[in-house]
Amino acid sequence: MEKRVFLIVLDSFGIGAEPDAAAFGDEGTNTLGAIAKHPNFNCPNLQKLGLFNIDGVTAGEKTAAPTGSFARLQEQSMGKDTTIGHWEIAGVVSPKPLPTFPEGFPAELIHEFEEKTGHKVLCNKPYSGTQVLKDYGEQAMKENALIVYTSADSVFQVAANEELVPVHELYRYCEIAREMLKGEYGVGRVIARPFLGRTADTFYRTTNRHDLSLKPPRATMLDLLKNAGKDVIAVGKIFDIFDGEGVTEKIKTTGNTNGIAFTKALQTRDFEGLAFVNLVDFDMLYGHRRDVAGYAAAAAEFDRFLADFILGMREGDLLMITADHGCDPSYTKTTDHTREYVPYLVCGKGVKPGVDLGTKLCFGTIAQTICEYLGVDASSLDGHSVWNEIKA
């Protein structure tokens, strides 16, 4: 029997503040709680799997007979960003946060970047990705400059207009930055942020974003699976997050709708191993932009896909749904990620329905469970498998 695991990360789909949320400035945040109240939120299939039965979830209506097993996962890494969240899902806890730059990057580093790219740098401070285009986009076009900005996350973001700086050139500049940003300046991600438009009112970010991540500090679930001869198919920004480490095939997507379509297509393919999917729009388009209505509608779109996907699952298939952090669209103190628990939903013909796993410490629960199911030794990874508790 072919064993396939479909692990889908709903990027930023948090389910309530973690105990240490106040230390991150995120006390009382709840992404699911915010969107579940909105009329656009219609998620009967997530409900059936047991989303609202998860420990501590007060939103929505519990189902009497969940079709999946479910848990609440608590992050052990000292961070709330995409890179650290995904590394922990893959079994690597980060005890120290990646460096952030609330005052902007050091002047000498920016000067070196200007020298190496031949472009002046504008901004160099934490900024909203859409607001930075309004405030600096026109000047960047006049001066053929690059807009460099950061956020509360460990990121070095470079924005440029595609008409002046071709996408391949922007990617090259980001590779230069990635080479420079090591050690104490070793941010989690360097992100190319191409945009189009001519004026502050018409600028918009294109889908040609590209992330250059730090390499994980040690082998992750992806490496272990690949080394064991399994397929590791990265859909969406998974390849970028792991800097390609442990990936056997990558599929680039342009957003949730496209990512969902690729995932559905993968279901018809023969492979043995892991399809690791990231659906980024929840975070990028709706969480950071504090768009509750858009987030709720995106959840409903994913839920519609679930019905067909579950029907099409084969004998040896497992479906796992989780998140990497929160990004509460109703939280107005910041536009950053929020420190939240994440859901863990598992279903398949080989999974017992309705197993309430309570709260588990460490997103690495996922890596351990996947490795045990696929018969791969995961003793080097963080977390504990729950496979024996949920197998039918």
Roles of regions detected by a PLM:
Residues 1-392:
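Feature captures the catalytic ectodomains and active-site-proximal regions of enzymes
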